[in-house]
Amino acid sequence: PVFVEQLLQMAREEGWLLDAVALSQGPGSYTGLRIGTSIAKGLCYGMNIPLIPVDTLQILCASIPSHLLPSSSYSLCPMLDARRMEVYTAMYHPNTLQQTTDIVAKVIDEQSFAEELSEQTIYFFGNGAKKCQTTIQHPNAHFIENVEPLAKWMQPLAEKRFLNGQFEDVAYFVPFYLKDFVPAPSHIKGLQ
């Protein structure tokens, strides 16, 4: 890809050495995860450097500015759109960014997170949270807009893994899809 070529050219011109490659491991778009993983694995294999996958939902958590959040007890709930009224989500501790529940593909309805919201404040964010805002109605539910899993938020998480030697085997790493790929039916005559 042209962007990768430009980035590597810039690194050569600046005299930068690549020590590892970090990537968002999912959940997320099937195609996006496949393309990103293929590029990252190719770079790691070709340059004989480590691969560092980072949980996409954790990257979303790292992007929340601390000044937007209270100092009292609450949880972070990143949400990635998984089509219709479904989201990829999990709960995270606000200080450590450690996952406190399993990552799931959750269909959102009026009862979603009702038990958790009865016990604590939850901050929802990510591209899946917007569609949930009118469905999840509770005084302890707060929504933060315009939060994306950008590389600049992944960098500190990846650096920590790098320093701790937390690498994946390049040959066997697969992204975290969470759901099986279901191709849409073709609308092109002759491919049906």
Model-derived regions, located:
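Stable alpha-helical structural segments in soluble proteins, enriched in small hydrophobic residues
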Residues: 7-11, 46, 64, 154-162
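Acyltransferase
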Residues: 144-192
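Short amphipathic alpha-helical face segments that pack within enzyme cores
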Residues: 2-3, 38, 59, 153-157
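N-terminal beta-alpha supersecondary unit
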Residues: 1-27
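Short helix-terminating capping/connector loops at secondary-structure junctions
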Residues: 13-17, 70-73, 168
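DPxDG-like acidic metal-binding loop motif
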Residues: 20-56
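Residues at secondary-structure transition points
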Residues: 2, 30, 34, 38, ...
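Surface "functional belts" at beta-alpha junctions
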Residues: 50-149, 177, 182-183, 187
